[in-house]
Swiss-Prot record:
Forms a cylinder of 14 subunits composed of two heptameric rings stacked back-to-back. Interacts with the co-chaperonin GroES. CDD domains: GroEL (cd03344). ATP binds at residues 29-32, 50, 86-90, 414, 477-479, 493. The lineage of its organism: Bacteria, Pseudomonadati, Campylobacterota, Epsilonproteobacteria, Campylobacterales. Its EC number is 5.6.1.7. InterPro entries: Chaperonin_Cpn60_CS, Cpn60/GroEL, Cpn60/GroEL/TCP-1, GroEL-like_apical_dom_sf, GROEL-like_equatorial_sf, TCP-1-like_intermed_sf. It catalyses: ATP + H2O + a folded polypeptide = ADP + phosphate + an unfolded polypeptide. Keywords: ATP-binding, Chaperone, Cytoplasm, Isomerase, Nucleotide-binding. This is Chaperonin GroEL.
Amino acid sequence: MAKEIFFSDKARNGLFEGVTKLADAVKVTMGPRGRNVLIQKSFGAPHITKDGVSVAREIELEDTLENMGAQLVKEVASNTADEAGDGTTTATVLAHSIFKEGLRNITAGANPIEVKRGMDKASAAIIEELKKISKEVKDKKEIAQVATISANSDETIGNLIAEAMDRVGKDGVITVEEAKGINDDLEVVEGMQFDRGYLSPYFVTNTEKMTCEMENPLILITDSKITSLKDLIPVLEQIQQSGRPLLIISDDLEGEALATLVLNRLKGVLNIAAVKAPGFGDRKKEMLKDIAILTGANVITEELGLSLDKATLDDLGQAGRVVIDKDNTVIVDGKGDSAAVDARVAEIKIQVENTTSEYDKEKLQERLAKLSGGVAVIKVGAATETEMKEKKDRVDDALSATKAAVDEGIVIGGGAALAKASKAVKLDLEHDEAVGAEIILRAVYAPMKQIAQNAGFDAGVVADKIANNSEANLGFNAATGEYVNMLEAGIIDPLKVARVALQNATSVASLLLTTEATVSDIKEAPTPAPTMPDMGGMPGMM
């Protein structure tokens, strides 16, 4: 296929057109008075959202040159969401503002490479200033404030997220699911839960709930498949004498072995239940080790030279309570050594830091949560499916932003932190490097201006008042139209969101400004369908 090549100003101007179209669609969602964007879907009802990254992901432009610019900035929005969890709109607005200012200077004759150098130095200096003015998140109230801001000022969602983080800790897993009704709810599973249910309904002890509940049980863990009870008889006799319930977690338990256990359970000889081991392959081995450490058991595996026929009560784990339904098993109050659990948690944290796979990272974090706290499920309710999708987007955003705030701390919100940090930066640069730095120092006012503009206020007046005020925490509350102490008003942003948004925006704008040529496909006109040949008159017609 033939390619189209554009150079210098023509290339950059085409890219800028694409960036502008994407930014214009995304930036209207910004702030407490941001507008909705309606997205057509190939099937079903249109999707209404105020989530910047959801809007950006849907945009594909017809012009190939413009589309290249839009796709690069779309990537910035996605990367910011992946890394910081929020700040997609901020990153898009910043990238557009930096590119616009930079393009004007480069068209006027500035050296793109020196401009880029100055931009990088100014961006790094602003991030250092942001770190200086940030503060740690100390209590549940501040967590709720961050979550509320990210959820577009929805206090109910903010409080639910704060409650969830309070219950399961910062390493706990918090998931978002759709509720059956219209109300939002929080459900916390304390202890370790894994997605394996009882192997036979005959193990059920609570017929009303169809669950098997065990108090103070012993737990036998093996990676072997059990088909015969012959090897288990010695340890089962010891358990019967102790009078305690037994949970067997094995690779599988079937045939004669399962039938015999069910029979003993029904006769009241043994209070017993069995479940399959969670996970697959190497992950299964690691999860069995996790359960063993949590309960103080030894994993009976041939790899360590252990066999079921030699197992004793010392090899079994213990827990305060176990609840099993047809799909899940929950182990509460494992009696394992707390130092061993802490060491295992530290080991998994190192694996999380070192892994490059997002899937592996997610699974490791789930294991971490199960060992260190528990799992919280935020159930989001809404009257319609369209509202449900929009609300779920907001909860996901708020949850990610809250985790970012706990990680790195918070700064004043509403775009004011970037403006204040910019004002504090003093750089001694010359020539086009100074031009590049000035581009960044001016561009970081764009998010604050956009928030004010979306709320119907004069963006220039708002920016000027905040920039020239010496009060460190002063900002503009776009919801009320007042100038307030942002920390006291609870209008705060995670430092990580502001930092990542500025870094990513500077990076992509630098790439676009130093682009000297573009190569793209020539869009071919569709070939017209061939016309039908003339059939002539049909014979024999009168």
